[in-house]
């Protein structure tokens, strides 16, 4: 009896649980239906040319016309076509002028107050364009790299601000009519958190870093004039297009892939296939390596359904060379018929999202997760890679408490949330203000996102999660460092760590290397302290479904 009593007394207490799950369904945020269609291009000049040739061939006249026609140079179709719209802000009335109807409808339902609009009209336009970008909604995520000589990039949609002295502001907002996927795209908007992350192996992680423009574009904020009798400022946007690179043919891509992937039948090397995710262009399985007994995740992608096949080649090549203990690493790849099989590490503990929404973490556990993530970020940043999607959904946990950033996102088509992307591009709760406002940015956008993720670990959700998506974007762009619900409950060194991560001034924001030396990380508990939380989160998740 005494032994039984001793056993009960020595049993560790259950991890603290959140009273209610803070996970919000992605479908709860309805910002209205977005129309991503664009105006049709002018008639193809080639058609008119063919008709003219036909009429000249049947009508009497000088036959030398044919000879002259052959000598005429071929005139190519219009390229880099832009449709320009004009948006201004009247400081007297507090109204935008010339705003597209679609934007006006979004703004009307955004819960951004009139006083907020008048206080920072430029931020309103920034977030409207960011939210409503048709390219953003269709963009795919792929691994990206920065130039060693330039940490920051100037967005191709940077702002030029000019004063208008006579009429209300009517500056151009460039709206690209060319939907070619190869064009440089603005920073993509991160989709809202789904109701439950079945498997973050179905997510893509690294997003494309837009190409540095050929010339610098001045970026400066606007503010309404203090004197209402003076004309409002002009809000000007310029779009610069990059030169298109020649596309690789499907056969060239297959030939290159054959030279990269392993030879052999993966069905003989791996066994016990179990499906854990299904998407538009592929399926994700767990499997067992016959030789080593290691459990792995295998992405099976139909190459015909991948929009940017050539980028997959670059990802495989780079991932083979970039291995790190804090990253879910690439292991192998195979061509099986029309499918590309990519083998990755598998972590059975699930995502950090389950832990932050179902349990309560203490500072020592939060410090341990932050340290592991910073080690991964220091590695990525030193290799000129910006992650740009740091959030709890993209942190995987092992049952031993190991913490790893998810893999380099081979194909966004695999994610099951694609149905929402056409009508709701989502709110980037973790995204740095400089990305939302399309300013120059570099690796420190990941540090901001890490700070937001630390707030997730404290409060169970990121700031502004329950705001209208457009207003959340506005608050990210204008509010600066988000406020904590109960900052007095945190230690001074934790508050300082958060302030270093969530510094609006990018120059003052800490780098991954600097923050690894922060005093807060010295209180980190062993990674094994996360195991009870992982087990408790798994149990709670099982009971919720």
Swiss-Prot record:
Active site: 389 (proton acceptor)
CRIB domain segment(s): 75-88
PTM-bearing positions, type Phosphoserine: 21, 57, 115, 144, 149, 174, 199, 204, 220, 223
Cofactor(s), by name: Mg(2+)
Residues annotated with Phosphothreonine modification: 84, 185, 212, 219, 225, 229-230, 423
UniProt PTM comment: Autophosphorylated in trans, meaning that in a dimer, one kinase molecule phosphorylates the other one. Activated by autophosphorylation at Thr-423 in response to a conformation change, triggered by interaction with GTP-bound CDC42 or RAC1. Activated by phosphorylation at Thr-423 by BRSK2 and by PDPK1. Phosphorylated by JAK2 in response to PRL; this increases PAK1 kinase activity. Phosphorylated at Ser-21 by PKB/AKT; this reduces interaction with NCK1 and association with focal adhesion sites. Upon DNA damage, phosphorylated at Thr-212 and translocates to the nucleoplasm.
GO biological process, one term: protein localization to cytoplasmic stress granule
Description of activity control: Activated by binding small G proteins. Binding of GTP-bound CDC42 or RAC1 to the autoregulatory region releases monomers from the autoinhibited dimer, and enables activation by phosphorylation of Thr-423. Phosphorylation of Thr-84 by OXSR1 inhibits activation.
Single annotated GO MF: ATP binding
Catalytic activity: L-seryl-[protein] + ATP = O-phospho-L-seryl-[protein] + ADP + H(+); L-threonyl-[protein] + ATP = O-phospho-L-threonyl-[protein] + ADP + H(+)
Protein location: Cytoplasm; Cell junction, Focal adhesion; Cell projection, Lamellipodium; Cell membrane
Compositional bias annotation for Polar residues: 220-231
Pfam families reported in the protein's UniProt record: PBD, Pkinase
Residues involved in ATP binding: 276-284, 299, 345-347
Start and end residues of each stretch annotated as GTPase-binding: 75-105
Alphabetical list of SUPFAM superfamilies matching this protein: Protein kinase-like (PK-like)
One Gene Ontology CC term in the entry: protein-containing complex
Biased composition (Basic and acidic residues): 68-77
Subunit structure: Homodimer; homodimerization results in autoinhibition. Active as monomer. Interacts with GIT1. Component of cytoplasmic complexes, which also contains PXN, ARHGEF7 and GIT1. Interacts with NISCH. Interacts with DVL1; mediates the formation of a DVL1, MUSK and PAK1 ternary complex involved in AChR clustering. Binds to the caspase-cleaved p110 isoform of CDC2L1 and CDC2L2, p110C, but not the full-length proteins. Interacts with ARHGEF7. Interacts tightly with GTP-bound but not GDP-bound CDC42/P21 and RAC1. Interacts with SCRIB. Interacts with PDPK1. Interacts (via kinase domain) with RAF1.
The family this protein is said to belong to: Belongs to the protein kinase superfamily. STE Ser/Thr protein kinase family. STE20 subfamily.
Listed name of the protein: Serine/threonine-protein kinase PAK 1
Organism (species): Homo sapiens (Human)
Organism placement in taxonomy: Eukaryota, Metazoa, Chordata, Craniata, Vertebrata
